[in-house]
């Protein structure tokens, strides 16, 4: 018997940036009754709250669920409330260097975005995302 099943969030459990539908939430709860489950995604913790946790009952079944935001560079588990067990965050200097390099590469490539939905370069603490 498997001890842990790991899923990607976007495009696997739910469409990209969308909440779990009722059927998937029910199936996930059933699975948590049998085995531990982890969900990983490139999104930040807030994205998991919106897409997953609002669709599940906040009860002891969540103690079998692990959440791995920002491609696994953060790790959350439930023990009556959600606790961050680790976060491999960049230092302020590392963030500045990454953002500066991204901005330089974008300018060098002559890439210009007409319209964005939020920040094009997003600081997720343990991940800098360009989208």
Regions found by a protein language model. Give the residues of each.
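Asp-based phosphoryl-transfer active-site loop
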Residues: 2-19, 39, 67
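A generic structural motif
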Residues: 126-131
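Active-site phosphate-binding/coordination module
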Residues: 19-120
């Amino acid at each position: 018997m498997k001890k842990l099943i790991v899923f990607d969030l976007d495009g696997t459990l739910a469409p990209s940036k969308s909440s779990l539908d009722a059927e998937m939430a029910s199936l996930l709860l059933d699975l948590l009754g049998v085995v531990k489950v982890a969900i990983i995604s490139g999104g930040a913790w807030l994205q998991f709250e919106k897409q997953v946790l609002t669709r599940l009952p906040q009860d002891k079944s969540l103690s079998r669920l692990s959440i791995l935001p920002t491609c696994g560079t953060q790790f959350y588990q439930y023990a009556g409330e959600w606790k961050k067990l680790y976060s491999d965050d960049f230092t302020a200097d590392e963030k500045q260097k990454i953002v500066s390099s991204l901005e330089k590469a974008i300018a060098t490539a002559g890439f210009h975005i007409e319209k964005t939905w939020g920040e094009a370069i997003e600081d997720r603490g343990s991940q800098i995302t360009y989208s």
